């Protein structure tokens, strides 16, 4: 029978020919907008982690809940768990020490210093893709082992804190003395969408180390935390892995000594698992059937657990005491000759050919084996620079212990930001340079002092544009990922920020504000910079006919140059800041995508981003003083002119350069050029979501709302790093 006859018969019976069989009628099914337009602007990234996804509600105060925690009891429960072997996932040598160290390490090790994203700070290991990464095989079991403890203590301890604390307790239980522990990591309730894990479509796709310097990626292969333990692209060559190791650990802000300490310390305890070929391993947690209840990688080999476990496919035990801290890693590394071999799963590894059988079997005390190592472990012996450090640690175990303690603390706390965010009884007293330390406050300005300072700033001769621009330059370095940057510390006045091209306004404005600070001696320079923005906005609002008081919270301090790591702060220099119409490079993403990226780092919503761009344009805050996007005949007035003129159909826009970065807006009737713009301006008229927001502020009744919304978003940015107010 023909298709026509089939359709006729269906219609004659009253059935719809297009909704039969297995059609998915569930919400979100079907072809999505991004399927049609894969380059669609990701405005949705600004809607992540809203209160709508948070079951605890916006009034939940984690710091307050943590203060109720019986911290000692929690650590006691974690210690007991380490040796409470469960039949569904038996512990190697009766201890989960190695498993929990790996869980903490792999949670923290996704951090990338280049953009501040990744890391352990939000408990992302619970969600895809990290919960199902090839490098995280079996960590689902570690998290499940922790569940009874999380259930017991509830919201007094976040998953994010619990993961790292479990790693610390595991180290301590092995006899190691850790540097300390700072709690304060707050859970989120959905995967991070903003992290660029790479554009590869297949797991374990190899990346050249040089490529890592051009993108914010933390691993040399998709789905790994760091490097391939078998060497680059399974080469089996220890020396060739050195560049990859330096690139990945360097992307976390680690130097060679920290890198050696972390690799050796992490491989002093525990083992890898490769009892048989990976073909025995089932689907990862995200792909596993519903009855698996979030557990993945079920193995069909033998019992699938214990001695039959398959994780990385490597079968390596590094030391004679895999549950107790020692210096055996370095002793074995240099004492024996190593021969390349393969694990039972076929993975490349090395065996100490001239060593006796001194390594205990994890499940049969009557058995021993030879020491084994990963390809990348031997890099620490054969790379000349790594070898020098390794030999020093071999001969000075205490130096190794100290280096690992500090490097582990840095690894697990790197994305937490300043020490002011740390809570708990084990926070170290020592300030560390990578924490961006700040001095104690010298000033406590009164309300009268603030009024007098505002008057002095207003009389200084600075323009509205200059006052607003310098405040933005100071505060907008903040990164929501690792909580670095911001106005507190006045590092705008220090190297390297004072020399950035985007901060050209600082050379004109800072001398005026510095002189004012010295003359009045009532507030820090950091406070005065932010207060200058307050004065500028209040003047601009008044010029627009709106009287408003911009909230200001004093208490910022001024950092010293010796408290500022120039190399690490250089990573905060923007390649683009659409709020100031700045673009340094054209080979990285689109201008509008980088605007979204900047807004997301500033934790802004789409409406907040929109109102800030519109307001800053009419206040003339472009980094170079250009008129791009200044769609107003009255600059310095906090008006809605940017939106009204952008959406005005009297103007037709055309590119003026081959890169389609600059545009002219001409009068459709006369052909006269009225305005110029960048992509960061025109996106608010071209993108359907942003246009909808722009229309709100372009309406005739939006003026007062616009000013209030602008002030609220502005104050949010100015206070992003005020962790002292928590």
Curated annotation (Swiss-Prot):
Site residues (Transition state stabilizer), renumbered to this chain: 102
Processing after translation: Formation of the three residue Trp-Tyr-Met cross-link is important for the catalase, but not the peroxidase activity of the enzyme.
Protein name: Catalase-peroxidase
EC numbers: 1.11.1.21
Pfam families xrefs: peroxidase
Highest rank taxon of the organism: Bacteria
Encoding gene per record: katG
Phylogenetic placement of the source organism: Bacteria, Pseudomonadati, Pseudomonadota, Gammaproteobacteria, Enterobacterales
GO terms assigned for molecular function: catalase activity; heme binding; metal ion binding
Binding sites annotated in the UniProt record for heme b: 267
Segments of this protein annotated with the region Disordered: 1-33
